[in-house]
């Protein structure tokens, strides 16, 4: 479980929003795409800031489902907090393609409405991601350098 960091008193709304985001990220990690699909609102906006933006929960779930068996995903949530329906995460993500593991930090913003995610916006440093890629490539030759969560 992640460390819970809050700036306002915990309310049922903040607790529900945090749990919805945790359940979504865990389902994504476990390739439980039925749960992923159910977690995303129809009007979802999914954005990797500086890169792509996808509108629609079904479109996003379809994209994620297409990666099943091709791109693995692992997540470690370092901190998570909420203010009402807005949830902020500080985490490390790993993308796994065959033997290649690319691990990097991510800050995510989620908005939850009626238990479903309507906004998923991730911020990450491209240079940090590039370092993760380089480390992953070197680890293919020197396995002891493989990153772990």
UniProtKB/Swiss-Prot annotation:
Keyword terms, alphabetized: Hydrolase
Regulation of catalytic or functional activity: Is inhibited by the anti-epileptic drug valpromide (Ki value of about 100 uM).
InterPro entries xref list: LEH, NTF2-like_dom_sf
EC main group: hydrolase
EC number: 3.3.2.10, 3.3.2.11
GO CC terms: plasma membrane
GO biological process: epoxide metabolic process
Reactions mediated catalytically: an epoxide + H2O = an ethanediol; 5,6alpha-epoxy-5alpha-cholestan-3beta-ol + H2O = 5alpha-cholestane-3beta,5,6beta-triol; 5,6beta-epoxy-5beta-cholestan-3beta-ol + H2O = 5alpha-cholestane-3beta,5,6beta-triol
Active site: 93 (proton donor), 122 (proton acceptor)
Molecular function GO terms recorded: cholesterol-5,6-oxide hydrolase activity; epoxide hydrolase activity
UniProt keyword DNA-binding, yes or no: no
Pfam families the UniProt entry points to: LEH (PF07858)
Biological role stated in the UniProt entry: Epoxide hydrolase capable of hydrolyzing long or bulky lipophilic epoxides such as 9,10-epoxystearic acid and cholesterol 5,6-oxide in vitro. The physiological substrates have yet to be identified, but could be fatty acid or steroid derivatives.
Family: Belongs to the limonene-1,2-epoxide hydrolase family.
Assembly with partners or alone: Homodimer. Is also present as monomer in solution.
Protein name as catalogued: Epoxide hydrolase EphG
């Amino acid at each position: 479980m992640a460390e819970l960091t809050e700036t306002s008193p915990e309310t049922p709304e903040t607790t529900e929003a945090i749990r919805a985001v945790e359940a979504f990220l865990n389902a994504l990690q476990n390739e439980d795409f039925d749960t992923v699909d159910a977690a995303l609102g129809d009007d979802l906006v999914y954005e990797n800031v500086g890169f792509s933006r996808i509108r629609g929960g079904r479109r996003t779930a379809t994209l994620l489902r297409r990666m099943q068996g091709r791109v693995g995903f692992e997540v470690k949530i370092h901190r998570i907090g909420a203010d009402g329906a807005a949830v902020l995460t500080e985490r490390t993500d790993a993308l796994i393609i065959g033997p290649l593991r690319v691990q990097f930090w991510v800050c995510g913003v989620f908005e939850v409405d009626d238990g479903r995610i309507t906004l998923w916006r991730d911020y990450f440093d491209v240079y940090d991601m590039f370092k993760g890629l380089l480390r992953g490539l070197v680890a293919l030759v020197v396995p002891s350098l493989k990153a772990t969560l």
